[in-house]
Curated annotation (Swiss-Prot):
Keywords: Cell cycle, Cell division, Cyclin, Mitosis. It comes from Glycine max. One of its GO terms (cellular component) is cytoplasm. Residues 118-147 have a biased composition (Basic and acidic residues). This is G2/mitotic-specific cyclin S13-6. Residues 1-11 have a biased composition (Polar residues). The keyword Cell division applies. Interacts with the CDC2 protein kinase to form a serine/threonine kinase holoenzyme complex also known as maturation promoting factor (MPF). The cyclin subunit imparts substrate specificity to the complex.
Amino acid sequence: MASRIVQQQQARGEAVVGGGKQQKKNGVADGRNRKALGDIGNLANVRGVVDAKPNRPITRSFGAQLLANAQAAAAADNSKRQACANVAGPPAVANEGVAVAKRAAPKPVSKKVIVKPKPSEKVTDIDASPDKKEVLKDKKKEGDANPKKKSQHTLTSVLTARSKAACGITNKPKEQIIDIDASDVDNELAAVEYIDDIYKFYKLVENESRPHDYIGSQPEINERMRAILVDWLIDVHTKFELSLETLYLTINIIDRFLAVKTVPRRELQLVGISAMLMASKYEEIWPPEVNDFVCLSDRAYTHEHILTMEKTILNKLEWTLTVPTPLVFLVRFIKASVPDQELDNMAHFLSELGMMNYATLMYCPSMVAASAVLAARCTLNKAPFWNETLKLHTGYSQEQLMDCARLLVGFYSTLENGKLRVVYRKYSDPQKGAVAVLPPAKFLLPEGSASQHS
């Protein structure tokens, strides 16, 4: 047998000595394929670089020269194109098929090198791979497809704005609502936490205790007699120095009782006395005694008459005396108006005028109170006459209150020449600001009524 020739493996970078047979290229030996390992510098081919057969064996010095040339070419290409490039080279193969690393300097950790852009240039990512560049292009397309919306004035908006300006319609800023309870936060008696719920409840139940139109069912009583009785009771209330709550509750009791019971004319004053006695017991700390009312009536009624009528009224009203009167709402609405003392006196003056006249029974207590505030602001020329704060707390707009406000101003304009002058004298006092002597807001009245009263 022929002896087997053992060929020594060629050392890296050395030529074959002895003229042995050359092995296959690209590292193919003994019919086996060997993959280039990534951790020894053998990287994938760069696009556009064609493998070429070396003309001579690659020694270490020759490999260093090739490496320097490759680095210079890559640097020149990067400076011209300003693009990302992979500087790794393909593996070089010796004549005997041993792979030799044709590579640049050891590959550094992948970092993004940002070139400071000029005003007309864009930032380029030098280390971006082709796949990464495609991703960046896709993101750029998405960004171009969804640009940030900029506020631009279209032709339609410009024309609309000009039309509004020509018609006198402008977008006025919304009026701020004043917190009327801010000053009472530390006042436990003000019950700021519950005040809104309390007045919502009052608005819900105010119609339950509201008397209906009863004059038609009273054969011996008319509106004039009722006005005389209320005028006299206001005088008695002033002499006894009772609270306003007592006065308003007295009138409420009278109207509710007359709505369910027919009363002869001779007992009308007795009903008023008994109603004030009950209201005084309910509201006052030191109410007047029964004998005081006997003396006020010039002994027209006895002690027993007053107590008997008191029981009759309580039975008819089913002992219900806790009701929302116009005063309950008036106090709140005056506070919402941010008033001075003059406005406070004027609103109370107009409210008592309304209480004295039967025609105001057609309106609920909250509307009478709100209309008194509106009429007072108009009389004193407090601009604006109505605002968002008043609208919020009253629940009424200015248009909804105009009919009732005109009614109150009408009573005011005829008061000076009328015979029932107790309210006029009361609010002509300097302690009340003498608001009764001020001219009424006749511009609220219809033209015919204004000329008639003037």
